[in-house]
């Protein structure tokens, strides 16, 4: 019997006790224990987890409970909305957490609240603000103390900060710094010993950056390892995340109908738990795979759904790439729409520039350089691409950076 199955009956038995603060205090503790047990077993956004957190919040709002219990409940509710890609709700709770913990004299509380805020800022496309917020969180980090708190917080919150900081650095083009943080995450994971933390930070600190960098072979290998680990350790939520990243990587490597079907199935399985975080990326990857097998209409429909998701969720971090892929669809359709493609690439470029998403900006600029005047000189392309390349630190192993550099030197051929 799982811990969650043990706690639930105890919550029900509380109602046989006499009314009063002692009963409410016990009930609050049991709801929190129930929610904490459900996180690795069921996921962050399932109805059972949310019900336990909401019940705990109602007791807290009646005046019962400690500061620690309040921050744990707020953190759980913020994470549930964040994983469900309800970014406005997650942001509101994260700001409540920051306001609350700024009045406390506890670095662990402050780290938890600033980490929550920084992760929401990242997925809403506020990369610079996210990095600043996550650096504030990191300043509160005590690796030994927070490692011991992994069981109370669900995962090691300090190590999670490093993962989110890594993402923000990648988007801002600080690739050498991001590589150093990635190595730090891997080093700390080796001796951690807390399965939910190992699963979570392997996905977010190793696999996610590989996906974003297009390192499909490494991602496939590490995702398969994560799925096996999560099955052994019963970390259900990240077994699903690993299955999703595995299917995504395989569709990148070989966009066959079979791999695309498996990818769609993995997305549906994730949605069944209430998790939608990262959907804009996965829809974009699915559209790219569909383009790879000539399913242009299906790719266009997938992108349409992705834009609707962005509008509904507030998840804007991959918006520039959705516009870029829209341009590619317009170029690939039976009657290529050059003007429509240019408009889409410009939207991608402008969106990425506003977000300071340097790699997205570079990809959009590369498409514009290819599309523009097919007789453009290397000098013309340098004027477009070099200012972006100049602010990207490192990345020589990345295909998008290599292709842009090749375009500026006239080495990469523009195919009509």
What are the roles of these predicted feature ranges?
Residues 1-140, 163, 167-180, 208-221, ...:
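Inter-helical turn/loop elements of alpha-helical hairpins
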Residues 19, 27, 106-108, 142-158, ...:
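Intrinsically disordered, low-complexity acidic/Ser/Thr-rich segments used as protein-protein interaction/activation
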Residues 29, 72, 110-115, 119, ...:
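Residue register of alpha-helical TPR repeats
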Residues 230, 275-279, 283-285, 294:
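Core catalytic ATP-binding domain of two-component histidine kinases
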Residues 339:
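NTP/phosphate- and nucleic-acid-binding module
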